[in-house]
Amino acid sequence: MTSILRSPQALQLTLALIKPDAVAHPLILEAVHQQILSNKFLIVRTRELQWKLEDCRRFYREHEGRFFYQRLVEFMTSGPIRAYILAHKDAIQLWRTLMGPTRVFRARYIAPDSIRGSLGLTDTRNTTHGSDSVVSASREIAAFFPDFSEQRWYEEEEPQLRCGPVHYSPEEGIHCAAETGGHKQPNKT
């Protein structure tokens, strides 16, 4: 794996997944989307997809053999999911805090305003997934966005998004660097 050079103040990327339980309910999906925006994440890329069984098994292979593995794989392939590449100064930790604890009972007790605390149903149907490290974020982003070049993003788009101005395009569902006068620059893969 190639090393990606980042400036010390560079934005960090993370993968955020919205699970089938939330995507199936438009009001819940919109509530999660609004939480992403209100917490000042930049949405770099987004896509909605129906996950293939073999891709899901590969993604969760570290959990193979655990008691919840089969249930998790079946659930994650049961309906559409939404994948985001999010950027923020400390995107991984901020997204994990916003999600709340994996276990919904615990989330309701210690982080009731978190996504999982307020919207999660069970430990599997807990609304969201997020990368837990820079290494896993890179791996997970590549799994869902194979045409996305993290290196090229850090070289070309990150400085523009970090230094602003930034425009959110509701039609595209992503943030783009805006030129003076409000015209946005094309967002390249």
Swiss-Prot record:
One Pfam family of this chain: NDK
Ranges in a coiled coil: none
Keywords: ATP-binding, Kinase, Magnesium, Metal-binding, Nucleotide metabolism, Nucleotide-binding, Transferase
GO molecular function: ATP binding; metal ion binding; nucleoside diphosphate kinase activity
InterPro entries per the UniProt record, alphabetical: NDK-like_dom, NDK-like_dom_sf, NDPk6, Nucleoside_diP_kinase, Nucleoside_diP_kinase_AS
Active site: 129 (pros-phosphohistidine intermediate)
An example Gene Ontology biological process: negative regulation of cell growth
The family this protein is said to belong to: Belongs to the NDK family.
Name this polypeptide is given: Nucleoside diphosphate kinase 6
Organism: Mus musculus
Lineage: Eukaryota, Metazoa, Chordata, Craniata, Vertebrata
